[in-house]
Regions:
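Basic/aromatic-rich interaction segments and small domains that mediate binding to polyanionic partners
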Residues: 2-74
Length: 74
């Protein structure tokens, strides 16, 4: 796994501020997740590795990993 630079993490934080709404586009293999493309959620925070943590409307909380998972603003 390649971690993003500090500049990229800052850009991710600016793109996905806490409280913004996102839609799941795709995610890496996770046999325990019931999330599907199109699911919506609210960003809680972005950590130092660029992982965007989301409280999903389905009731789960899951981090979207930089370079593996894809979300978009709604």
């Amino acid at each position: 796994m390649v971690f993003p630079t500090k500049e990229i993490v800052q850009s991710i934080r600016e793109t996905y501020p806490s409280g913004c709404r996102v839609e799941l586009v795709s995610m890496g293999y996770d046999p325990y997740s019931k999330l599907k493309p199109g699911d919506l959620g609210t960003v809680t925070h972005v950590d130092s590795t660029g992982t965007v943590f989301v409280n999903w409307d389905r009731g789960s909380g899951l981090g979207m990993v930089y370079g593996e998972d894809h979300i978009r603003l709604v």
